[in-house]
Amino acid sequence: MSPTPIKHYLQFSDLSADEYEYLLDRARILKAKFKNYETWHPLHDRTLAMIFEKNSTRTRLSFEAGIHQLGGHAVFLNTRDSQLGRGEPIEDAAQVISRMVDIIMIRTFGQEIIDRFAKHSRVPVINGLTNEYHPCQVLADVFTYIEQRGTIAGKTVAWIGDANNMAYTWIQAAERLDFTFHFSAPPGYQLDPAMVPDWAASRVKVFDNPLDACQGAHLVTTDVWTSMGFEAENDARKRAFKDWMVTTAMMDRAADDALFMHCLPAHRGEEVEAAVIDGPRSVVWEEAENRLHVQKALMEYLLCGRY
């Protein structure tokens, strides 16, 4: 085991390709231990603080179960029930909370909130989701693809839907892990140029037609049309995205061995056909489970370094 200095995981680009190679292999090992009921407690007596401003099922369950399986325990903090929800400065909260726990996961709205928190934290901070990025989910998706098909390097990932936190995280992953990213969304929901790095021109291709975006893709993925915090736009988004539902016809344009993923929860008949998400090319349940294993690998790495 080689200890590391304090390192945060706030967006996908925070780790190098070499670190991802280690993490993904470590996730494979930890998943095997889990399946074999093998006890592994490198985080014995360590405490994870989980701070939620946005509610979640999968994020809370995967982090809470994950730290427990590694020998530690979790403390759940909802901002509505803490001083953070009563106007305590983020910087002050970071100083206090990070003196009482060993690692912190935050699921919130603006990326600047978690960036400010991490700047004043004495322990590692993990982005459980922000409006801008969702690195833990893309890490799980990448692991799922590798588990099913081998390396993701040189492959094509097609994103059909909103320019949201998942799309921007996939762009960062394309650079780190050497694959191509296809993006398609209706007018008015395109990528924000300020969120797309200069190097992206060599990795990212934007398509007006979602069928064209799926052509030859090895992975087709999507998300809900209306993310949390945008509920007032729901009706307008349903109208705008009606031709961006992932269909069997789109999957038929993809590579013969293409997979379908969705970070869930899904709305069948909106962003994806039931025949696709419930069909043989879908790996959404493996994808959901793998949040648990990649996050265990991540917490182990941030606290213990490499084994």
Swiss-Prot record:
The pathway noted for it is: Amino-acid biosynthesis; L-arginine biosynthesis; L-arginine from L-ornithine and carbamoyl phosphate: step 1/3
Q: Which UniProt keywords apply?
A: Amino-acid biosynthesis, Arginine biosynthesis, Cytoplasm, Transferase
For this protein, what is the EC number? 2.1.3.3
Spell out the GO cellular component terms annotated for this protein, sorted alphabetically and separated by semicolons.
cytoplasm
Q: Does the keyword Cytoplasm apply?
A: yes
Identify the residues that bind L-ornithine.
Answer: N165, D223, S227, M228
Q: Which GO terms describe its molecular function?
A: amino acid binding; ornithine carbamoyltransferase activity
User: What is its subcellular localisation?
Assistant: Cytoplasm
Q: Which reaction does it catalyse?
A: carbamoyl phosphate + L-ornithine = L-citrulline + phosphate + H(+)
**Major localization class:** cytoplasm
For the biological process aspect of GO, one term held by this record is: L-arginine biosynthetic process
Give me the residues that bind carbamoyl phosphate, please.
S56, T57, R58, T59, Q83, R107, H134, P135, C136, Q137, C263, L264, R291
Q: Does the keyword Transferase apply?
A: yes
Q: Name one Pfam family in it.
A: OTCace
Question: What family classification does the UniProt entry report for this protein?
Answer: Belongs to the aspartate/ornithine carbamoyltransferase superfamily. OTCase family.
What job does the chain carry out? Reversibly catalyzes the transfer of the carbamoyl group from carbamoyl phosphate (CP) to the N(epsilon) atom of ornithine (ORN) to produce L-citrulline.
Q: Which NCBIfam families does this UniProt record tie to the protein?
A: orni_carb_tr, PRK00779.1
Q: What is this protein called?
A: Ornithine carbamoyltransferase
This protein's species is Cupriavidus metallidurans (strain ATCC 43123 / DSM 2839 / NBRC 102507 / CH34)
Q: What is the lineage of its organism?
A: Bacteria, Pseudomonadati, Pseudomonadota, Betaproteobacteria, Burkholderiales
